[in-house]
Amino acid sequence: MPARCVAAHCGNTTKSGKSLFRFPKDRAVRLLWDRFVRGCRADWYGGNDRSVICSDHFAPACFDVSSVIQKNLRFSQRLRLVAGAVPTLHRVPAPAPKGGEEGDQAGRPDTRGELQAARHSEAAPGPVSCTRPRAGKQAAASQYSVGTEEITCENEVVQTQPHADNPSNTVTSVPTHCEEGPVHKSTQISLKRPRHRSVGIQAKVKAFGKRLCNATTQTEELWSRTSSLFDIYSSDSEIDTDWDIKSEQSDLSYIAVQVKEETC
């Protein structure tokens, strides 16, 4: 039979993963252990050499530091106590379930579902007619104001066809003509096309001189100018050639005269 902890409301063994410690041989320390056990057990008269107490009843300062490190690293499963360690922690008993109340609850019928159903039935709204809310929504949509916008509309009465479920005709108001009042800047929308054009589309014609000429007249003027210049150049060249011929003839006559004088 495995050894069990002798403390009240505790029965831990080594199979529970707890370390068990035998009562010390020192008489003074053993008396303190007995007093601890007797505090919760009236039938305890004294422990013997086989009596043990588990590690749950000792404070952390009662354990050897090296044994704690070894257990945390899983090198060892058993803790060691320092000299003169005394148990001080009692285990609180778990509350036992009350059998009388459970029997009463089992014997009583389950009335929670009925109470919840009654509450839901009270809170649930009844059926609402479909004609009035629709007319109210349409009227609210036709008359609205945004910011400082004030719109007065002349409504035209339009009769709709009677619905199969509702024989009465529903009359709704549809806005046809509106007169706009002062409107806030953030709500103004201009639907008109702008009168100006983009910069990339605008075509500007710059007039040089007092009048504009087409391409044909400009080419004729250019041709007349070039022809006149050509005539001037040709006449100048002819004058130059005539002058050169005359100068050469005068030079030849001068040379002939000199030759005649030398021969004479």
From Swiss-Prot:
PROSITE patterns given in the database record: ZF_THAP
Stretches with biased composition (Polar residues): 160-175
Transmembrane domains' residue ranges: none
Zinc finger (THAP-type): 1-90
Composition bias, Basic and acidic residues: 99-122
Gene3D superfamilies, per the entry: THAP domain
GO molecular function, one term: zinc ion binding
Region (Disordered): 90-136, 160-195
Keywords: DNA-binding, Metal-binding, Zinc, Zinc-finger
Superkingdom, taxonomy of origin: Eukaryota
Signal peptide: none
Pfam families registered for this protein in UniProt: THAP
Name of the molecule in the record: THAP domain-containing protein 10
